Amino acid sequence: MFRGITTLNLDAKGRLSIPAKYRKSLGICCDGKVIITVDLLEPCLQLYPLPEWEIVERKLVALPSHNRQARYIKRRLIGHAEECELDGHGRILLPLELRSRTELGKNISLVGQGNKFELWDSMVWERQMAKEEASAKEELTRELALLAL
């Protein structure tokens, strides 16, 4: 399970050093092989251990090709999927094509999502979290008012 948020630096060659606490898990579960693809809704990338991606990919392939939304989802997720591998130093080269499709800069937030990671530009991540927190507080305030708390 991948948990927590870690701020990392992307080097000049576009490599991201995966924290040691995750390297062993990635080595055991997928021999360091991962799939990186775009996110459908957010300006971030998704990083899946290969076995987790294969589960997602099977579900995507099973979607009906005559359905417009299903085709869009498959084109985005499968079409942008890149297989990457941890090098001997625990780094992953983030493909330039994928980096250019998001707002990834030098500082990256690696966000654990249980079975995968999200990769965010750290400033974009902070803005997104502030926006979501403000929205959640408004909704929570309404719910608490209804409960008379």
Curated annotation (Swiss-Prot):
Gene3D superfamilies: Transcriptional regulator MraZ domain (3.40.1550.20)
Residue stretches making up the SpoVT-AbrB domain: 5-52, 81-124
Record's GO cellular component terms: cytoplasm; nucleoid
Compartments it resides in: Cytoplasm, Nucleoid
Keywords tagged on the record: Cytoplasm, DNA-binding, Repeat, Transcription, Transcription regulation
GO molecular function per UniProt: DNA-binding transcription factor activity; transcription cis-regulatory region binding
GO biological process, one term: negative regulation of DNA-templated transcription initiation
A Pfam short name: MraZ
Cross-referenced InterPro entries: MraZ (IPR003444), MraZ_C (IPR035644), MraZ_dom (IPR020603), MraZ_N (IPR035642), MraZ_sf (IPR038619), SpoVT-AbrB_dom (IPR007159), SpoVT-AbrB_sf (IPR037914)
Protein family per UniProt: Belongs to the MraZ family.
Protein name in the entry: Transcriptional regulator MraZ
Organism per entry: Nitrosococcus oceani (strain ATCC 19707 / BCRC 17464 / JCM 30415 / NCIMB 11848 / C-107)
Lineage: Bacteria, Pseudomonadati, Pseudomonadota, Gammaproteobacteria, Chromatiales
